[in-house]
Amino acid sequence: MKSGEKDYSVKEAMIFSQRIAQLSKALWKCVEKDWQMWIKPYDLNINEHHILTIAYHLKGASISEIAKFGVMHVSTAFNFSKKLEERGYLVFSKKEDDKRNTYIEITDKGEELLLRLMEEYDPENNSVFNGALALRNFYGKFPENIELIAILRNIYGQDFIDIFEKSLEDIEENFTESDQKLVKK
């Protein structure tokens, strides 16, 4: 292959890109609906819930980290964090050695809310989970999504994937099931 030549065709690239776009849009539609239905009784929106979750798993984070790991603009992360602070779920702070960045930490009230939400999670009301259940029943495990993770690693970086994996490991290590509910150990 000559320098500057690509080892894929434009047609191949278009088909792949469109496949990912269409599948992602369809999947997001289900994820968004399920997520909204889960958190609606607690008067939270998806961004607020995501911020609380990130703050919980990171044990505090800068607004920039929240934006990065929450895949949102910094102003979105700040504005929704401010709303959560007003409701007593987060506290803002500055560090002595870093006055430039604003940091947030989940409060006891915020943690209680998040833990209650985790306890209230019902897989029966999750269409993506139910859609994948047939694969689990056939193969004995849920899809691991390694190709999707590899794509996202190339787009967002290894630290994005590390935080993603850490949050899942946190749930694995620090929560248990009791009466078909997820509770903190």
From Swiss-Prot:
InterPro entries cross-referenced by the UniProt entry: HTH_MarR-typ, HTH_tscrpt_reg_Hpr, MarR/SlyA-like, Tscrpt_reg_MarR-type_CS, WH-like_DNA-bd_sf, WH_DNA-bd_sf
Gene3D superfamilies in the cross-refs: Winged helix-like DNA-binding domain superfamily/Winged helix DNA-binding domain
Record bears the keyword Ion transport: no
Biological process according to GO: negative regulation of DNA-templated transcription; response to stress; sporulation resulting in formation of a cellular spore
Keyword terms, alphabetized: DNA-binding, Repressor, Sporulation, Transcription, Transcription regulation
DNA-binding region range list: 63-86
Domain HTH marR-type: 13-157
GO molecular function, one term: DNA binding
Subunit composition and interactions: Homodimer.
PANTHER family named in the record: DNA-BINDING TRANSCRIPTIONAL REPRESSOR SCOC, TRANSCRIPTIONAL REGULATOR, MARR FAMILY
Record's function text: Negative regulator of protease production and sporulation.
Name this protein carries in UniProt: HTH-type transcriptional regulator Hpr
